[in-house]
Amino acid sequence: PGDYETEVCDMRLKDKLYDEAIQAANVALEKTPNHRGAIMCKALVFISQKMYLEANEELNYLINFLEKTIEDDDRTGIGTLAAAYANRGIINDRNKNYEEALQDYVKALGIDHEAVAGPGLGTIILNYKFKSSSVKERALYLNEQLQLPEDERVLKIEKLDEGQVMHKPGKL
């Protein structure tokens, strides 16, 4: 229960119908409390609206829930956990909390590097002005920059950072 509404949330998110997306996610959560796809979709809606505090709350809840309940053979759950860390890293990155962003990116990569590899070439060609960095590329870059003296660091490049994509598992 709740999978259909989670798919609706994802579709409304893609259409930038954020209120409808949140409504669909909430219906999914009424049917199945702790529906991980619905929680992730709400977080992605909040990130899209630059409501980072709300997104962070959803992601923190999801991370805590998954870390307590996930089974070793639950590939979707593992991918969702990695995506949650990656998305929390993006929030930290956008809020200029670069050390925390790096920690989240490294955690995401350690959990499931394939789940957070980023969009494929076809998706990039169709949807993005710039090639966005993958979680791995961004983690390596941040790590390199954080080693430099503060006055030499370049941690934000507005044009490129705008293209940073959120991560979600194959199926919410």
PLM feature spans:
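Alpha-helical tetratricopeptide repeat
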Residues: 1-172
